[in-house]
Amino acid sequence: MTVPERLSALRKCMEEKNIDVYVVPTADFHQSEYVGEHFKARKFITGFSGSAGTAVITKTEARLWTDGRYFIQAAAQLEGTTVELMKMGEPGVPEMNAYIEEVLKEGETLGFDGRVVSVGEGEDYAAIAGKKNAKVNYQVDLIDEIWEDRPVLSLSLIHISEPTRRVV
């Protein structure tokens, strides 16, 4: 599937689940800096492969927020996808939460996979929804419903290393 086809499938799923705005971060269950293949949902839905960024999908728009390290890469990878690049920190570019607050209407539902957002982010989203008398659905991984060949969760053993130096 192309990115526009994935977005179309996601929007259909959003409609079926009564989700009006859906947030797709770059994160895993442990808030790791670099995520395994299973957790590259934002890459799957936007086509952007950088290690940092968050997508916000509405019924009619798809936007990706990323920082200056990735402006050139993101612009190239988003070309032709209908995903709009939001260059964080640049003049005239709204902060992501301000955009969510703008597009989320009263009585609508903001959705995200609560397993991959921090408590702080979840609280921010709940506060935005509260201002709009909107609902929050944090128990929905819509990407999993449309990503047919999604890599399975890693079952590798965890290895605990000894500290490299000890402090007296």
Region locations from a protein language model:
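Intrinsically disordered, low-complexity, positively charged segments
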Residues: 4-46
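A general structural motif
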Residues: 19, 52, 59-61, 105-109, ...
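Structural motif
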Residues: 25-27, 66-68, 88-90, 112-117
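Short internal beta-strands
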Residues: 54-58, 62-67, 111-113, 138
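Short acidic-glycine loop/turn motifs at beta-strand connectors
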Residues: 57-61, 78, 130
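Compact, glycine/acidic-enriched structural inserts
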Residues: 68-102
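Hydrophobic or amphipathic alpha-helical targeting/insertion segments
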Residues: 100-153
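Single conserved hydrophobic/aromatic residue that forms the stacking wall/gate
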Residues: 159-168
